[in-house]
Amino acid sequence: MIQDEIKVSTQTLQWKCIESKIESKRLLYSRFAISPFRKGQANTVGIAMRRALLNEIEGASITYAKIKKVKHEYSTIIGLQESIHDILINLKEIVLKSESFEPQKAYISVLGPKKITAQDIKGPSCIKIMIIAQYIATLNKDILLEIELNIEKDRGYRIENLQKYQEGLFPVDAVFMPIRNANYSVHSFESEKKIKEILFLEIWTDGSLTPKEALYEASRNLIDLFIPLINSEKKEKNFGIEKTNESNMSYFPFQSVSLDIEKMTKDVAFKHIFIDQLELPARAYNCLKKVNVHTIADLLHYSEDDLIKIKNFGKKSVEQVLEALKKRFSIQLPKNKNYL
């Protein structure tokens, strides 16, 4: 019987948050358990997840501040308690969340006397300040302080060179690392007379996202790394060795089941990959979100003609989407519905 010939894996991974707490306003902690793994698998996943958490998750940060009539960062302003240098340090500590992949501008315009906090920062709706009570400066006199802030989204950290900035622009050593720490441990147990493993994963975040959100994003980023392998097409050269007799060469096993893999990729993997991974400009991204296109799978239901009919979605936005799909996932949308 066909049923007897098919071997189905009974190993279904399950995860559970077993501990969660707020250690401080800017430090969230959760501990997750993921199992069951076969022997050796938990360590492989643990290493990959920890590195993805620490290195692949984007964060938002202020990258520079523009203050008129100020020559250098150690300048002082009459009526302002802090030096410019102190203000820059305080700006660096502000925890932000950005829904845009494009640099954004925000502004501080305060008339003293007043204590200035992150709540006084005014910016676009795509920028969210996580701790509004974060201290910035104090005005002791009846003076106006105006600061323009540049906010970017990136990975890792960035130390700017002051010399490349014009007078009045002050770089901030930006930290784009919402994950403060990540650890894992592996423990063995016996199940059905077989040795299985359970992975414990600990995640600390700065509050701009929860540990659960971080776990999802790290998982999506790892999936993105392998999608191109699944979608890879035959090349004229394989690992740098020229094919002299194509009929005698053996290819990756993917190729013999390319149709099945393509269907699996569209039906399963793309449902878990959000359009954020396309890194589209804010205009194209926001237009897609307004018509409930949240994942790559949602986007695959559209043709080029469908996209251009979306409100405020111009030809340039269509080109940006097509280019991003081709670059990231080797996907080309059909011209019209007839080819879907």
UniProtKB/Swiss-Prot annotation:
What are the annotated disulfide bridges? Answer: none
GO MF entry, a single one: DNA binding
Q: Which reaction does it catalyse?
A: RNA(n) + a ribonucleoside 5'-triphosphate = RNA(n+1) + diphosphate
Q: Mind telling me which GO cellular component terms the entry cites?
A: chloroplast; DNA-directed RNA polymerase complex; mitochondrion
List the EC numbers from the record: 2.7.7.6
GO-annotated biological processes:
DNA-templated transcription
What InterPro entries does this protein's entry cite? DNA-dir_RNA_pol_insert, DNA-dir_RNA_pol_RpoA/D/Rpb3, DNA-dir_RpoA, RBP11-like, RNAP_asu_C, RNApol_insert_sf
Would the keyword Transferase be found if you checked this record's keyword annotation?
yes
Q: Which Gene3D superfamilies match?
A: 5' to 3' exonuclease, C-terminal subdomain, DNA-directed RNA polymerase, insert domain, RNA polymerase, RBP11-like subunit
Q: Which domain of life is it from?
A: Eukaryota
Coarse class of the primary localization is: plastid
Which compartment or compartments is the protein found in? Answer: Plastid, Chloroplast
Q: Which UniProt keywords apply?
A: Chloroplast, DNA-directed RNA polymerase, Nucleotidyltransferase, Plastid, Transcription, Transferase
Q: Which HAMAP family match?
A: RNApol_bact_RpoA (MF_00059)
Q: Cite the domain annotation text.
A: The N-terminal domain is essential for RNAP assembly and basal transcription, whereas the C-terminal domain is involved in interaction with transcriptional regulators and with upstream promoter elements.
Q: Which family does it belong to?
A: Belongs to the RNA polymerase alpha chain family.
Q: Please report the name of this protein according to its UniProt entry.
A: DNA-directed RNA polymerase subunit alpha
Tell me what organism the protein belongs to.
Marchantia polymorpha
Q: What gene is behind this protein?
A: rpoA
